[in-house]
Regions:
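A Rossmann-like FAD-binding core segment of flavoenzymes
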Residues: 84-132, 155-164, 191-251
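Glycine-rich dinucleotide-binding loop and its adjacent helix/turn
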Residues: 8-30, 55, 91-108, 131-193
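Short secondary-structure boundary/capping segments
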Residues: 76, 139-140, 214-219
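Local cysteine-cluster metal-coordination motifs and their immediate loop/turn environment
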Residues: 1
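N-terminal Rossmann-like FAD-binding beta1-loop-alpha1 element of flavoenzymes
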Residues: 35-60, 182-193
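Glycine-rich FAD pyrophosphate-binding loop
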Residues: 57-73, 198-208
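Cofactor-cradling patches in redox/metallo enzymes
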Residues: 77-80, 84
């Protein structure tokens, strides 16, 4: 019976957690006395903090939000990446010596000069939160939102209310502009928030259903694919979900 790489990796990871190997691998053999501040607790910040702690540095991570994790906590919806998985890793990091300072934005709540006085090294892992915007009429209207803000607020609601999504879109029609993974996450999130209908605009042309001759293996296949959010929308709503070679010129 064939098995997927995902299943193999999941088994290895869960076995390591169950046997305490993850925590064991993070315990430093010695401390070198050097204090490091890591600004940002997204994937890069967490990876950096973990490795520096392994090497014996005294690491403190500064995060402006109320939970560590950055993109993994706020940018990826809970149904795609359950937040307890992120929290599990953060808990182990704390147990092996990494410290987290939350609700603290560098440059607002604490300043660079202060960090320089307290730490011998500073790592900037602040991520890329500036989204691509649309400079079209009506962009400023209420209800027109950037995906990064929408998904962040949706996750904060889930963290506040458990795994139950708010129903702020109940009975409303939603248009998602963009056909990538983030757009797919927005579709799935809107469904869970009670949207009456969801449609999508994609600026590129629809890929072919089969791999073209000029796109042989091992190149990444340029073929049409349907994400989990799109599959859900196709099941729930009538009509064509995605309109290709189309973008918004105004709201």
């Amino acid at each position: 019976k064939g098995i997927t790489i995902r299943n193999n990796e999941r088994y290895i990871i869960e076995t390591a957690y169950a046997n305490g190997w993850v925590k064991e691998s993070g315990i430093p053999l010695h401390r070198n006395g050097i204090k490091v501040a890591v600004v940002g607790s997204g994937p890069a910040g967490l990876a950096c903090a973990w490795r520096l702690n392994q090497l014996g540095y005294d690491v403190t991570v500064y995060e402006r939000d109320d939970h560590p994790g950055g993109l993994t906590m706020y940018g990826i919806p809970n149904m795609k990446l359950p937040k307890e998985i992120v929290a599990r890793r953060v808990k182990i990091m704390e147990e092996v010596g990494v410290k987290f300072v939350l609700n603290t934005e560098v440059g607002v709540d604490v300043f660079g000069d202060e960090l320089k006085r307290e730490y011998q090294r500073i790592v900037l892992a602040i991520g890329a939160r500036q989204a691509r915007d649309l400079n079209v009429p009506g962009r400023e209207l209420e209800g027109v939102r950037l995906a990064v803000d929408y998904l962040t607020d949706a996750t904060k609601s889930v963290l506040k209310n458990g795994t139950k999504a708010s129903k702020e879109l109940e009975g409303k029609k939603v248009m998602v502009i963009g056909g990538g993974d983030t757009g797919n996450d927005c579709i799935a999130t809107a469904i869970r928030q009670g949207a009456a209908d969801v449609k999508q605009l994609e600026i590129t042309r629809c890929p072919p259903s089969k791999r073209p001759a000029d796109n042989p293996w091992p190149q990444w296949p340029r073929v049409a694919k349907t994400g989990y959010g799109q599959e859900e929308a196709n099941e729930l709503f009538e009509g064509v979900l995605t309109q290709y070679e189309t973008t918004a010129v105004g709201f």
